[in-house]
From Swiss-Prot:
MBT repeats, residue ranges: 20-120, 128-232, 242-346, 354-451
Tissues with expression: Highly expressed in the testis, low expression was detected in brain, kidney, heart and lung.
Highest taxon of the lineage: Eukaryota
Sequence ranges of Polar residues compositional bias: 680-691
SUPFAM superfamilies, per database record: SAM/Pointed domain, Tudor/PWWP/MBT
Compositional bias per record (Basic residues), positions renumbered to this chain: 660-679
Domain spans labelled SAM: 793-861
Subunit relationships: Interacts with MYOD1. Component of the SLC (SFMBT1-LSD1-CoREST) corepressor complex, which also contains KDM1A/LSD1 and RCOR1/CoREST. Interacts with KDM1A/LSD1 and RCOR1/CoREST. Interacts with MYOD1. Interacts with L3MBTL3.
GO molecular function: chromatin binding; histone binding; transcription corepressor activity
Phosphoserine sites (modified residues): 764, 772
Name this polypeptide is given: Scm-like with four MBT domains protein 1
Length: 863
């Protein structure tokens, strides 16, 4: 795979698209959600199928091998409150059980399976003849269906029994009451995709119905009602009669779905409509207005045919649909006028103003009386500007966000947002089974069409970049983000949530955690766009630009004392082949972006202008050019007053021959001394010279407990970052003991004091000595004479010295990582290897020169 292909693959695998967030969308639009209780059909589908008073056989809680009869007292979704028979009205022994886990069986199961049926110990002596007692108790009792209990034992809800491939009966709701078999293609939360039996999927006769729809029934319903099973007229010509009968015979041999699944369906009452009665109606196939309509046919006392009036010649197709007495969308004449609504005159109507009195006289018809129509739902909780999820009437496979634009009686006017094609405002009943509460699609795994502006709000690109691919990948991911934010298909986000461009000012001081070289390779800016989206990308790039990404992720981790009140976003980091995750708080509004960036910079101990909405061209307002890796806290301080330890034997880089290397490294206890106040005349006690760490890296020792809050990826070994970072800190901090000549060299007062403190508060150097591949000896015959105090060397002075040695190729690293004299004096072999990515040979060679500087410092300037 070439570089470009690898890059494309990395980009493709590193991008995640998150789902639409209702919470963010409601905040942006200032809307409210329709109450969950308003969607009765959704609430019904969550019911378990159990009802108070049902009896069943249940295992005793103290003896699972023994069973007794219990009565359902209360059913609450998956929980049942049960009472054993014999306790009467005594509630003390009532108990709750999970219907999926408890052993629940129908009455008679114990006898069939030769199980012990015995009363609980608490009431065992209460009745002398339990057999007679049960016979009296169970006479006329009802229990849950056997299929329901079997399904629950297999981990299936009642609704799950309507699985793909199941057969049902469906009435033809266009022109007659003929009923035919349909096959369930999909079941999404009770919303069924159906196909007429005998047809192929590509025939175009698939349709969607909710499982409680009045026109959908269990197998056998037509025979019970006296209706004939025959295919609808629209498909009848596709096969001959013999083929249809063969299909019917095959279906009848199959075991049907249990009828109790449909027990909550609406009961159809008898109607009082007559042929030629006039009314107002909403065409269910085009529910965008109210039109005059006529009762064209009465099939029986339950069903009739409504036809939308059309005064044009007969060769035009008539729009008709089957109704029953409770059908929504039919109104008495003048209903529109009384509710201040417009009624669409029938096509071919010549007058501009439609008047019912004139129209009835013209047609010679009578209006259907008020008593024929269903009772209006007087109490519901829908209000204008509420949001919900609704089926697209033109494309029933699509569910979109909808806004209630008007409420009239028990009817809603909805406007879809985010549908694939524009759809006019349409009318639904408050009891429609094509509307759903907030989050229904997400809960049931149904795709939700969302507005483009909202979709842009939550689209996120997450770059989890390998360290060695950081430079190239970060640029590529940024280009993808830029293209997304500037896409012509995205609509401008609400200004309150629109983040300005965030610039990376790589000339500013990068601090102890961030690699200045990697910062310089980041894109110039990210954004503009949604605040959460842009800031998430910025923080991801910064984490990947760190010496130790997991350390920066821990610094950024959500603090319980946070004052931002933003949103928590899960960010990722990779370090040494392990993946880490942590929740980081990000502000959501544009007015807080500047301060958020500044405080994040301070938290990372870098220049407050390193990244933010302001581009630094030449001179930083913070004058951060005077800062080095060792001088940050003198100017900005630390957010937390952490205890920082000094590495034992900090004056020497290499192990000496005076002590043997310990065979096995022991875990060093984290005992620390307080940080001394910085003085320009003394060597800083904190290991800030480490390019990776400054004070922060040895804070790993003090903060190891914090790493438990980082979630390690599944690919890592079975140990947390606490152990990993302890080892790293140990390796860096446990420098070998000083040489004999060092020990005889007088030290500055502060240094001597600190050395005594470190020696009394830490374990012996013999225990802390890191393992080395072989004993390393350093001869210090080559005396070095220094013209200036290395403690006061600038970065340029350090680079100049390195270039004068045989380690000149490494000078660039010292320049990039801004290592000044103080930092140079604190470098150790483990630190050099880890932070400069040097192999052992070059690292030893470099440390040899650093050792010479240290000896010269002690001899010339220590006093």
């Amino acid at each position: 795979m070439n570089g470009e292909q690898q890059l494309d693959a990395d980009l493709g695998s590193g991008v995640e698209v998150e789902e639409f967030s209702w919470e963010d969308y409601l905040e942006e639009t200032g809307a409210t959600t329709a109450p969950y209780a308003s969607f009765k059909h959704v609430d019904i589908c969550l019911q378990s199928g159990f009802a108070p008073g049902m009896k069943l056989e249940v295992a005793l809680r103290k003896d699972p091998e023994t069973y007794w009869v219990a009565t359902v007292i209360t059913a609450c979704e998956q929980l049942l409150l049960l009472r054993y028979e014999g306790y009467g009205e005594d509630r003390k022994a009532d108990f709750w059980c999970d219907i999926r886990r408890a052993g629940l069986y129908p009455i008679g199961w114990c006898q069939q399976n030769k199980k012990t049926l015995e009363a609980p110990e608490g009431i065992r002596d209460k009745v002398s003849d339990w057999s007679a007692f049960l016979q009296r108790t169970l006479t006329g009792a009802c229990g849950p269906p056997v299929a329901l209990l079997e399904g629950l034992r297999n981990g299936r809800n009642p609704l799950d029994l309507i699985a793909p491939g199941s057969r049902l009966e469906c009435q033809d709701f266009r022109d007659s009451v003929s009923t035919w078999i349909v096959t369930v293609v999909e079941n999404i939360g009770g919303r069924l995709k159906l196909q007429y039996e005998g047809l192929e999927r590509h025939d175009g006769f698939e349709h969607w119905l909710y499982y409680l729809d009045p026109f959908l029934h269990h197998i056998g319903w037509a025979a019970q009602q006296g209706y004939e099973l025959q295919p609808p007229l629209a498909i009848r010509h596709l096969k001959n009669e013999a083929d249809w009968q063969e299909i019917l015979a095959r279906v009848k041999e199959e075991e049907p779905l249990p009828s109790y699944l449909f027990k909550d369906k609406q009961v159809i009452r008898t109607h009082e409509f007559s042929i030629n009665m006039k009314l107002e109606a909403v065409d269910p196939w085009s529910p965008f207005g109210i039109s005059p309509a006529t009762i064209a046919k009465v099939f029986d006392d339950k069903y009739f045919l409504v036809e939308i009036d059309d005064l044009r010649p007969e060769d035009h197709a008539r729009r008709s649909f089957v109704c029953h007495a409770n059908s929504p969308g039919i109104f008495p004449v003048q209903w529109s006028l009384k509710n201040g609504l417009h009624i669409n005159p029938p096509p071919g109507f010549r007058s501009q103003d439609f008047d019912w009195a004139d129209y009835l006289k013209q047609c010679g018809a009578e209006a259907a009386p008020q008593k024929c129509f269903p009772q209006s739902v007087s109490e519901h909780q829908f209000k204008e500007n509420m949001k919900l999820e609704a089926v697209n009437p033109l494309f029933p496979e699509e569910v979109s966000i909808a806004t209630v634009t008007a409420v009239r009686g028990s009817y809603l006017w909805l406007q879809l947002e985010g549908s694939k094609k524009p759809v006019p405002e349409f009318i639904v009943s408050v009891e429609s089974m094509n509307i759903f509460p907030l989050g229904w699609c997400e809960t049931n795994g149904h795709p939700l069409s969302t507005p483009r502006r909202a979709r842009g709000h939550k689209l996120r690109k997450i770059a989890v970049v390998q360290p060695e691919k950081q430079i190239l990948s970060s640029r590529t991911v940024h280009e993808g983000l830029k293209n997304q934010l500037n896409s012509p298909h995205s609509v401008m986000i609400n200004g309150k949530y629109c983040c300005p461009k965030i610039y990376f000012n790589h000339r500013c001081f990068s601090g102890p955690y961030l690699n200045k070289g990697r910062i310089a390779e980041l894109p110039q800016c990210v954004g503009p766009g949604n605040c959460v989206l842009v800031l998430r990308e910025v923080l991801t790039l910064l984490i990947n630009a760190a010496y130790k990404p997991s350390r920066v992720l821990r610094e950024l981790q959500l603090d319980k004392d946070s004052v931002w009140h933003g949103c928590g976003e899960v960010l990722k980091a990779k370090y040494k082949g392990k993946s880490y995750r942590a929740t980081v708080e990000i502000v959501r509004t544009a007015d807080r972006v500047t301060e958020f960036c500044r405080q994040t910079c301070i938290k990372l101990e870098c220049c407050p202008n390193l990244f933010g909405p302001r581009m630094v061209l030449d001179t930083c307002s913070e004058n951060c050019s005077v800062l080095t890796k060792t001088k940050y806290t003198h100017y900005y301080g630390k957010k937390k007053n952490k205890r920082i330890g000094r590495p034992p034997g900090g004056h020497s880089n290499l192990s000496c021959a005076l002590k043997k290397t310990s065979k096995r490294r022991k875990r060093r206890k984290n005992i620390f001394v307080h940080k001394k106040k910085r003085s320009s005349a003394s060597v800083d006690n904190t290991p800030v010279g480490s390019p990776q760490g400054s004070g922060g890296e040895d804070e790993d020792d003090a903060d190891d407990g914090d790493d438990d809050s980082l979630t390690e990826g599944s690919t890592s070994e079975q140990q947390d970052e606490l152990h990993e970072e302890s080892e790293v800190s140990e390796k860096k901090s446990c420098s070998p003991s000083p040489t004999q000549s060092e020990m005889s060299t007088p030290l500055p007062p502060d240094t001597q004091t600190d050395k005594r403190e470190a020696q009394t508060s830490s374990l012996s150097d013999g225990e802390n000595k890191p393992p080395s591949p072989k004993e390393i000896r350093i001869e210090v015959d080559e005396r070095l004479h220094l013209d200036s105090n290395p403690l006061k060397w600038s970065v340029a002075d350090v680079v100049r010295f390195i270039r004068s040695t045989d380690c000149a190729p490494l000078a660039r690293i010292f320049l990039d990582q801004e290592i000044d004299g103080q930092a140079l004096l604190l470098l150790t072999l483990p630190t050099v290897q880890e932070c400069m990515d040097l192999k052992l040979g070059p690292a030893i060679k470099l440390c040899h020169h650093i050792e010479r500087i240290k000896f010269a410092f002690y001899e010339q300037f220590a006093n």
